Amino acid sequence: METFIVKRDGTREAFSMEKIQRAIAKAFLSVGSFATQDVITNILSRVSVTDGISVEEIQNQVEVALMAERYYTVAKAYMLYRQRHTEDREVRDKLQFLMEYCDASNAATGSKFDANANVENKNMATLIGELPKSNFIRLNRRMLTDRLKEIYGKELADKYIEMLNDHFIYKNDETSLANYCASITMYPWLIGGTISIGGNSKAPTNLKSFCGGFVNMVFIVSSMLSGACATPEFLMYMNYFIGQEYGTDYFKRADEVVDLSKKRRTIDKVITDCFEQIVYSINQPTGARNFQAVFWNVAYYDRYYFESLFGNFLFPDGSKPDWESLSWLQKRFMKWFNRERTRTVLTFPVETMALLTENGDVKDKEWGDFTAEMYAEGHSFFTYMSDNADSLSSCCRLRNEITDNGFSYTLGAGGVSTGSKSVLTINLNRCIQHAVKNGMHY
């Protein structure tokens, strides 16, 4: 019966003993020695080849056999030979990828490892970001399997790699060393600017510096993440700076003209211009993320969620957040953003509505009705409903128990701060197909 081996590209090929003999002979010649047939036979007697064995496994056995026969210099030469060929293959694969990427019809088609990334354009920036992804995948898998072996043993570590390769699971941040996503508190930025996270801007002092500084802060944080950056306090802080300039009752005078320039803008127009500056800036691709836009999340609250999270919150001047004006601002932003999306494609922010429930219904009827109204108008956002305001969700899957800070991300302290690393997605379709094919119950 003919024996087949598995090549590096996954194809099967008939096993050839002559190829191994030639490789061993070349290794001896490279160190100025000569391998007789008896020597080669003794070495090969230690190599076991079975049907379906990989090329790498055969070569590993040859290395061990050379060491066992005490041909240490030859074994070293053989190892170096394998390493050079590995490097040559990697360079060849990179060149092949370059050609295929240039010929691809779009960035998703050209992406070999991360086709679902937040990339819209195929250009040099996205190409540069794609090239090292295969190396990051190998590094991430090595670090994680080493940790799995340490905790659970080799069998589970091997099973993890098998499930990845067979597409039963997908690891969201394998192509980067960065954490996947984070929900951050903005308070360190409010009192110290971006200096604590590597920037050089000072704390915001007015509405204009808040808008520009907020965009810079989100870009800096997002450059250190491979996924989303959530800012649950965004509108609360913006509301504070609007109140500093126009008074906490500004929402009652939204039609009042406050701009003495030729534009004669009202308070409402000033606010929507700030919305426009922030949202359109953050939706632009950035070089720090390989020409991807920042993945940005925000949160809205009903009165009870707000009071639970920020009831004891104080701004640097000692003032407390004002719910009435914030409630108006949240609604204004949702209305504006929903209408703006009819004019152009705006992916971010991803919005989450946090509603407290009681006896199976929303506790804050006003915000329950407004949520239904926004859905009726075609707005797209997440809704997180909980009977305990001790829990907060900042995006589609990220949930934080505020009373338990054991799972708290280090960019900030408090109920809104949390994060994730090594996020796994289960491929249910693949699991069901496998179960049906093998007559298993799923």
Give residue ranges: language-model regions:
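Charged, amphipathic alpha-helical regulatory modules used
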Residues: 1-102, 107
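Conserved catalytic cores of very large enzyme subunits
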Residues: 88, 94-442
